[in-house]
Amino acid sequence: MSDFDSYAADSELEDFVVDDEPPVDNSNNPQNPQDESNEASETRDRIRDLTTALQPNETPTQKLLKAHISVLVTALGGPDHVGSLKDSSSEYKLGHDALACLKDIKRWIKSVDEIGHKYDVALACADCGLVENDLTVMLCQWDSQQKHSNTSKRTTEKIMLSALEILVLLTWPVEMSSEMSENQQLNFVAVRKSQLVYKKHILSYNNGQTFKAVLRLALPTISKDTSDREPRDNAILGLVLFFIRNMLYIEPPSLSTSSKLRKTMMEIDNLPANMRYDDVSINTVLSCFKRNKVLLFLLTMCGSLGSDFDRETFAPCCLECIFLIVRGVEARDLVDNVRPVPETNDANGNNLPTLSSTSDMALQDLLKEEKRRKKVQSQNISTRHGRFGTLLSLQGENSSYVVSGQEALSSANQTFAQLDKSKKWNDRKHFKYDSDAFVNTTPNFITSTTISLLKEFINEFLVGGCFNSLMSSVGWIFSGASDLSYINEYEKASYFLTTAWFFAYKRARIEILKNRILNENEDTLDYGSVAAGLSEVNFVLIIGYVRESFERHYWDSLHVAMICFREMLLISNSVFESKHKDTNSEQDEEDRDMAEGIIRKLFSLEQFVNLITHIPQSASKHSPEYLSVCVSVVYILLKSFENFSKEDIKLYVQSKRKQRRNAKNFKNVDSLELKDIIEGSDEEIDEETVKQVSRERKFDFNKTEMKFFQSSIVTAHIDFLSRYEDLTHEQIKQCLVYFHRLFIVRKDYSGLFRLDFLHVLNSLRDFLPRKSNIRNHVEEFTFHFMKRFKNLFRRFPNPVELLFPRMEDESLRTYLSLGEVVEKPIKKAKEREIRYAKELEFTRSNFSEDEKYKILVSAIYFEDNEKFLSWLIEELSRIVEIAEKDSEASTIKLQVQGEYEPLVLENATVRFLLENVGFVVPESSSDECTCTVGTSELTQSLEYIKKWLSVQPVAFDEDKDASHYLRVRDDANDGEFNIGYDENEDEIAFETAPTNRYREDLEALDNLEELEARISSSNGVKGVARKKRRPKGKISDTKHRSKPSSTHRKPRNLGVHSDDEEDKPLKSGEYVHDSDDESDNEDARAFFEREEKLRRMLTESGGIVNPQQLEEFKRAWGKIVGGEAVDNVLSTLGLQTGASQSSLPLASQSQVDSQPQIDSQPQIDSELQSQSLSQVVEDGPSVESTQESSSEEFLSADEELPARKKRRVIDDSDEE
């Protein structure tokens, strides 16, 4: 066999194209032409297979798309190896249609990846090496050749902008979410790895010259004036910012944990081949940014927002860049120059090289953790029996336990702990990691070089006012939104986390560098450089953000909000702690005002204070980081309350005051006091009201502090302390302070009598090192706790209460803690006042019995009282059955009990139905409902009720309602019945209609309207008509029915009316009826006659100038009222004629004569007109002048008349 035959038999070479065998003469053996065609088709199929072979999970469409993208990338350009033989590196040559190729690639990305929700084009570009071999090479070469003349400069810039746009699209961050399509989920890991390759190449290629080329594209736009910029210029700046943001955002994903396998860590190869974490770490990024002036560009953009750059366009992206730079960096590390020398020994004491990379620093942390765990383990097994096997048997009466392991011999606690490990817990507590999406829980390991670089950048960022400019711009955008829910959650988280980080940085810097001398170019040691974060707008935003996140259960956002809220509290708390150290500085007074302002703004709303007390109650259900933030917030709040109580600082919260409807304060108010209310100025403030409001709105520190010691919050602290192995000593101390305040300061002993707390406290004491300071605090608290616990444990039922959650009743807590029984006074429930209904009648008297029952049953049915009708049928059936069995039975009664008793007393339709049946309806709850008809009438009524109830709903003529055929009896207005008014209603029903009266009458209407408004705001006066309230089911008389009036009074019509116009009836006349309505005409005539006599006396006598004359005048007036003639009284009155007549508010006689007498005028108008004359004369006190007498009528004996209450009196000159 030939060599060719041997290779052809190899199956691995089947896909290779090989030369055919030499032609053989087949003349002697002719073959069928069909066989030749089959051989040719087999050859063609083999070639097609070579070109259309698919990769795993690849479709023919993807294969074709990759081929198309490959053609475009090839046509874009490439290295010119021929034209650059003399150079060491080849020059990149653009293709003839390079710009068109870039635009086509952009269209493919937009149409397939973005619109189609796929990653096919992005993966095709990655396979073709578009970013590494073309885009970055083009940009860097263009930046290097900027000094050379270029004839097609404009075209080249367009190509570079297109290259930048594709770079932004290919490096746009991707995040795994449930909204991703199946294609995106399948290719997510591949796309993320390709982005890491892009980031490494961009940072390393020519020392990151790509950034310098990108910034060069933005320089023409920056140099332009704001008014000269076009939308295209803003788009270029946006592309540059997005490219910087993408490079900061792309990071290797952390290790993922499977939720199904609790003990197995699912490790994924997160990095591409030939890549380390140091290649894309924050250290490499910041050093590259520093070399290529990216940080300077960010300072320029952030510092000029609002002035040179549109803040709504660029502020969010600038904020995100700053947030990504400082995320995961400990703020105190940038301030503390004296850093401790890192430990460079492993767990075995071997020396390690100097830390110079991120991986080395991560390894150092792992070795520290290993060393700590070995130390803890060695404490438990370091016994003299450590080298021998251990088997401990515990024998009981009915059972035995065997414990194995060396830890069981060290102490009794370890023995019990070993027993607990062998048990299987069915009720396991697991944290829900649903609150850490925006919080970077894994810290960034930054080197000393990066620390100095970042410290310099942050200093310039604060000194240049960039922080205030950036935060003011973003805050302006957020505050301008109608609702924070319309803003992206990630943008809100970036804003508040950045604010919190700079607060922590400033607080640490002031704390560490307070006594040091600073350079001129360093940031000052105050909070002026972060003033935008302490502005009024930011406090409104943080309060709204906390409320929205808690109400919508956005735990990730709430975690962010609590971090920012904690930093604000820490700033206020740090000021009070430092105040006692240096009280002579003027800066301390400003800091004190600022600290008070923070608390005042945060706790200005009562709803927010209540919200803060609810958040820690559910904190133990979420991640440990979120629980840690909530515990620290509670600790700082309690400390702040203590500081404010010591400083005697008073806070006031805004709360909705309850309007107390108390009409009894106005029952005994006479008309003069009502007039004083009308004439009093609105600007006057009642001191008692101010004191009451101050007491209601004063922030009670003790009351608010008590809300933080509920059982759920105590449980959250116990759960947090149970993870003591992962806590720092500072966090353990915070929990101890909380328990100390609860148990010792507040003496709430039963709050900590819990088995879980006893177990945690015992385990914590054994875990802490013996020589540590925190262990001394734990032992001291344990001593006081057990001392009290032993005494109370002997008292029943404390041993039982240990097994169950504590009941929050105050009397039970007092009994468990002190053994005292507190008897609460039993509050008697107020009996509801019965409101009796009016009597009804039919609109026509010729209704038949059948029609009457049809109307009544339908009316009750439409009042949703169908159950009453069913009950009535049962009762009537029972009564008829009893009457038929015992015809000589005594009076038959309707047994009205339970829920139907109020209907019989208060529902007019029900009472009318019972009357038609033949019952005597009760007038009170003690009366009985007796029957006055015979058995035959009851049987007939029962049949009517059954008949019409079974066919409900019933239609009437012309679609009328059943209530249309019922009305209130004419004599039903007398007596104390329920007419639909409520004395406690805030509004008055009657309105005044314009009449053909003079100006004096219009002023009286003004007084009346003002009186109504005052009474309405003061919860009303008894006897004044109120707004009509028609309860459901009440049927009123049709002729007494009026249109419902609106809540607001209609504007009074002051137009001129003709004499022939009819006056509109007063609405109050429909409801207000007094006992002397029929004698209104006689009373009005007598009133005007008496008024005329009084005016005549005052005019002829010359007025009243001293108290003696006033007494004589009052005696004379009494004689006139008694019926004596006016002339006789004037002759005997010893008053001087011709005295001053301008001291009393009198009107001319012509006005009185010309006043028309309106018979329908309500009595309240007459009282308002007469009180300025008659009542002043009859009840006026002894004063020096008449003017003072009329003014002091409205004041108490020891009250002074304010200047604003003195009203101008009406003299003769006002008559016109």
UniProtKB/Swiss-Prot annotation:
Ranges of Acidic residues composition bias in the record: 11-23
Chief location of this protein within or outside the cell: nucleus
Amino acid composition bias (Low complexity), ranges on this chain: 1139-1151, 1165-1194
Stretches with biased composition (Polar residues): 26-35, 1152-1164
Region described as Disordered: spans on this chain: 1-45, 1018-1082, 1139-1216
Cited Pfam families: TIMELESS
Source organism superkingdom: Eukaryota
Compartment(s) where it occurs, according to its Swiss-Prot or TrEMBL record: Nucleus
UniProt keyword Nucleus, yes or no: yes
Alphabetical keyword list: Cell cycle, DNA damage, DNA repair, DNA replication inhibitor, Meiosis, Nucleus
Record field: compositional bias (Basic residues): 1024-1033, 1040-1052
Cellular component aspect of the GO annotation: replication fork protection complex
Keyword hit for Heme: no
GO terms of molecular function: DNA binding
Biological process per Gene Ontology, one example term: DNA repair
Sequence ranges of Basic and acidic residues compositional bias: 1064-1074
Subunit structure: Component of the fork protection complex (FPC) consisting of TOF1 and CSM3.
Annotated family: Belongs to the timeless family.
Function of the molecule: Forms a fork protection complex (FPC) with CSM3 and which is required for chromosome segregation during meiosis and DNA damage repair. FPC coordinates leading and lagging strand synthesis and moves with the replication fork. FPC stabilizes replication forks in a configuration that is recognized by replication checkpoint sensors.
Protein name: Topoisomerase 1-associated factor 1
Native organism: Meyerozyma guilliermondii (strain ATCC 6260 / CBS 566 / DSM 6381 / JCM 1539 / NBRC 10279 / NRRL Y-324)
Protein's gene: TOF1
